[in-house]
């Protein structure tokens, strides 16, 4: 009898044992939200921006300031603005000629070399945006890298806002607005007639310069007058010792010939609210989102800077991000690269949420909402480039880069401020 009990006990003990493995452990699914739809693959030049016209035409820019391989020199065939003409090919836009400044994008007759000061050629375009009237605008920094990776200073004529197919289509920035070390990064447009005396609308531009003079530039599109606000304010500057991680790797700044540093990009992502009454922005070197009433930025009176600095709202942390975009729901979309994700801020309740998550997402650079109800965005591995620390070599980018799209929630579409 005792033996029978012992055998029974042993059997119960054996049946109570569980397999020792990870199969029953909860794990990160890696994906969330609507699936990504592949739109375009880039096999040649390094892209940042994406813009979608009302008819579905796609445009991108290739800034020579972020990759010396995109700097135009005579005979190399490079361009800084292109139309995506098939799933895998691009063509210079609006022409190869305007993308080919005589002698190249760098003026080697100055010391040190500087950006070519051509007002009628693209030098180093950082952004292309389609406005509410379906017009394309190109934001040119006037800055590019030399073959050894040195970022040259801009000269007058280089930094500009160019409206394609407009009667007066180029707005030059004075050197008191676009400094030689400025980096004009992104732009948004409000074309409502009541926002400026000229009745032609206004543009808001971020200056994300890593050299430090960050701020917001405002442009009257009718008169061409421009001015700055919030210069050096903490809201447009990177956080001290800001460090983010991508796919397990710390993103220290990789400064050639110098010790590793921190991400020093200032105000970059920018978006208007759906009613045009607020402007949102965020530094790449920060997780904090800020906004200001646009009326405070359009004011250029004697006390306007004092009033502007007192009107800023801090909306808290929204993750590591670059570009922004808006939809008719009022949501402000942004990357959340540490989560392989796209998030959105809801001004109506002050919360930030994840909308899409996928292992294919690394650095979400630029967004564009289409009138077709989709959110388009570039994924370009910027964080794997030579500008960031890497323990696996100076450049870990692997072609191709990509444009994806996802449907906007709740029948969202492009906001037309006009």
Show where each model-derived region lies.
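Fungal secretory targeting signals
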Residues: 1-17
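Beta-propeller blade signature
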Residues: 76-87, 154-169, 216-224, 392-411
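Beta-strand-rich domains and repeat architectures in extracellular enzymes and scaffolds
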Residues: 31-79, 126-127
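Residue position within the beta-strands of beta-propeller blades
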Residues: 60-61, 138-140, 205-206, 281, ...
